[in-house]
C-alpha cells in the first residue's frame, strides 16, 4: 500500500451491511501526550508520515535528535528516525508539544531518561527546486507538496545554477523535478536547453500578464551548461544533497555524480498508475527511516 499504511482486503460481502457514515471532512489522526507527566524527554515515533515534516519546519527552533536505530523505551517500540526531544533544551516545550501533537496527529511519549541509542540532529534544510525552461509543469507537483506541508524553498532555474559557483553557501538540498522523457535518452538536452536566434522572454507584459509569476527571465535560451554541472558537483562534494526525479536522474548518472548507478529502461513495461511492491535493501539509510521491509511504490 502507499503512504506506509497497512490495509486489509475483505472479500466477504457482509462488509457492505456494516453501518457506515459518509466522510465529509478531512480525516485527522488523533494525537496527544502519553507517559510521564513531568518528563525529561519526549519521544515521537517516526513512521515516515509527512505530518512530521510539517511539524519540524513549523517548529524549526525546537532542538530535535533523530534515532539512528530502532529501540524500546518504557515498553514502547520506536522506529529508526524517531524524534527525541530534551525538555531542558527547549523553552515551554510541554505546552508546545501538546498543541503540536493535536495539530499534526502524533503521540509524544514522555520519559524520564534519554534512550540508549545513537542519534543525530534533525535540522531544517535550506531547500531549492531547480527547473528548466523547457518543462516546468511536472515539477509543479513538488512545489505543491512542499507548499502543503509548509516547507519553504527557493524556486531557481538552471541558469541560476549555471551562474552560481557557490550553491552550498545558499542551500543544503536541491530538488530537480522530472524533465521530458526524451532527456533519459539524451541528457545533453538539459545542458543545451532551448535554442534559437532571438531572445525568448518569459515574463509578464501587456500581452502576457499571467506569465512569470513563479519565475521569469529575459531569455529562456540555453540550459544548465557544463558550468552548471560543475557547480552541482561541487555542491554535492561540499556536503549538499542533490535529489533528482524520474527522467532528470539521467543528469547525475551521465556526468559521473552517481558512480555505479545506471538508468535501466524497460520498453516492455509501461504501467503508469500501477502500485508495485518493493523491498527495502538498506534499512540503515535515513531515507528508509520509518518504513517496514516492504514498500508500495507508484509507477
What is the predicted function of each stretch?
Residues 1-299:
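Intrinsic-disorder/low-complexity accessory segments
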